[in-house]
């Protein structure tokens, strides 16, 4: 196959940051996506409706594709109220709220200290039909970083799923076979996003032969057996899994340091990277469902009506890309990618 035309895709989990870098991050994300769900862990975090709408306006001011629509999410804290959820839902522009366990990832210090603290907020979300997005890791110091997703599933997410059966939940950027199995065995109200980098890489890529800081992300890359389980889930055709890049840019110097930031930048070539994975598995026919259909169907949003075309054409990823007044190192920098969106 040398060309593949699919319904225009969406990205259901992306970080654009804020300020001067928006001109670059929005350029990449709006190049061929119809919509993108924008993560709210900016500085300061997007904790209320007014902040979300203002952030949306700043994004729209930089968009490059007329077809592009940013979808917004609220950042849940111990102080989030049911009234704020209702207010956000009423805008029609804020489609979800994000649960970050405090300290779990970049700019998550204001996150929720205990999910039970906001059960009344989950009740309101269930009532109005707002989706719950979950960063699925515990933050206890005694739990090994490679085990934090599994521990979260057992101790935090399972009770939420049980206590709120009508709440739609997306387990974001899953990284383990445990998470894939959890989603497969849960009700149809539970789904998951999977990143391109967790499909393409495992912890050996990050650690063998020297530390590769641009592969460092949270949740952290796991062993090969987990990577294979993610590939199987993503390419299976199951409606429970869909595209969410978790593209998370940091300036080159913030990554290549003694205490580097977590996050990998893939928005420059996300669909092309996913296409490589699906082609390698002989499952290109399932890429459209994963990238373009399952996400809007789960969110209850109309599918995009136009298309994009991928061509089998090798191209070189640049060593760096503009990031405001700085630069970012994209995934596969100085390497070739075998598909290209035309």
Curated annotation (Swiss-Prot):
This protein's pathway: Pyrimidine metabolism; UMP biosynthesis via de novo pathway; (S)-dihydroorotate from bicarbonate: step 3/3
Transmembrane segments: none
CDD domains: DHOase
Catalysis performed (reactions): (S)-dihydroorotate + H2O = N-carbamoyl-L-aspartate + H(+)
Modified residues (N6-carboxylysine): 98
Amino acids binding substrate: 15-17, 41, 135, 218, 250, 262
Active site location: 246
Keywords per UniProt: Hydrolase, Metal-binding, Pyrimidine biosynthesis, Zinc
Keyword Ribosomal protein: no
Pfam families: Amidohydro_1
A single GO cellular-component term on record: cytosol
Binding site for Zn(2+) 2: 98, 135, 173
Cofactors, names only: Zn(2+)
Subunit structure: Homodimer.
The protein's role, per its UniProt record: Catalyzes the reversible cyclization of carbamoyl aspartate to dihydroorotate.
NCBIfam families registered for this protein in UniProt: pyrC_dimer
Name of the molecule in the record: Dihydroorotase
Organism: Vibrio campbellii (strain ATCC BAA-1116)
Gene name linked to the record: pyrC
